[in-house]
Design a protein with these regions (language model features):
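Conserved beta-strand scaffold positions in the cores of enzyme catalytic domains, especially
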Residues: 7-11, 80, 132-134
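A glycine- and Lys/Arg-enriched "phosphate-lid" helix/loop adjacent to the NTP-binding pocket
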Residues: 74-124
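NTP-dependent small-molecule kinase module
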Residues: 125-187
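Conserved substrate/cofactor phosphate-moiety recognition/catalytic segment
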Residues: 1-49
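Short, structured coil segments at secondary-structure junctions
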Residues: 3-5, 74, 128
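Conserved nucleotide-binding/hydrolysis micro-motifs of P-loop NTPases
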Residues: 14-16, 60, 84-90, 138-141
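Short, surface-exposed amphipathic charged segments that create phosphate/polyanion-binding patches used
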Residues: 24-25, 93-97, 146-155
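Glycine-rich phosphate-binding loop used to anchor ATP phosphates in small-molecule kinases
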Residues: 31-83, 118, 125
Length: 187
């Protein structure tokens, strides 16, 4: 979806893979840190030069949410497409499967911290966002189908107005605090 947009797109996981491929012997931790710093620089440049940039982040730390809030305070339109899972255990299982398929791992403590902090950071960003779409990606796809699951839209807010989905009663438990904050903020 983002690759088809007019914005530049940055995925730190893909950047880390390219770094490792170009630098045999580079460890995953160093590649991840380097890719993260590259993404931070790209975001700072996009803010300073008012460029369009789409990028992936967990929102689990403090730097990216701070930069996004800073961008919004400068009048830059900030849109977030947030994709969540039902629990940290679901994330841990997905990472385990990724590792089994040859991908990189993430320490369990980091997954749990990011799961908690990303939702808190999203709630804190709600007042300044031009648009937010929240998706539940908790459903696993049928391996026989060999395709990714289709995330379910949980909340869509545009310029302070909740525009969807029509039935907020089916909001999954993990997203209820976020939806409640949006309702309190935007009515």
């Amino acid at each position: 979806m983002f690759r088809a947009s007019d914005a530049d797109y940055y995925n730190p996981d893909e950047a880390a893979r390219r770094l490792i491929a170009a630098n045999p012997g580079l460890d995953q931790t160093t590649a991840n840190a380097t890719a993260w710093r590259q993404g931070k620089r790209l975001l700072e440049r996009a803010i300073n030069e008012r460029l369009d940039l789409a990028f992936e982040t967990t929102l689990g730390g403090s730097t990216m949410p701070r930069l996004l809030a800073e961008a919004a305070s400068q009048g830059i339109e900030v849109r977030i497409w947030y994709v969540g899972l039902a629990s940290p255990e679901a994330h841990i299982e997905r990472v385990r499967r990724r590792v089994d398929a040859g991908g990189h791992g993430i320490p369990e403590a980091d997954i749990r911290r990011r799961w908690r902090h990303s939702r808190l950071n999203l709630v804190q960003l709600l007042p300044v966002l031009t648009e937010v779409r929240i998706y539940d990606n908790s459903q696993d796809a049928d391996p026989a189908e060999a395709k990714a699951p289709r995330p379910m839209l949980v909340l869509h807010v545009v310029r302070g107005k909740i525009v969807g989905p029509p039935d907020l009663l089916s909001t999954p438990g993990w997203a209820k605090p976020i939806v409640a904050a949006a309702i309190e903020l935007h009515g």
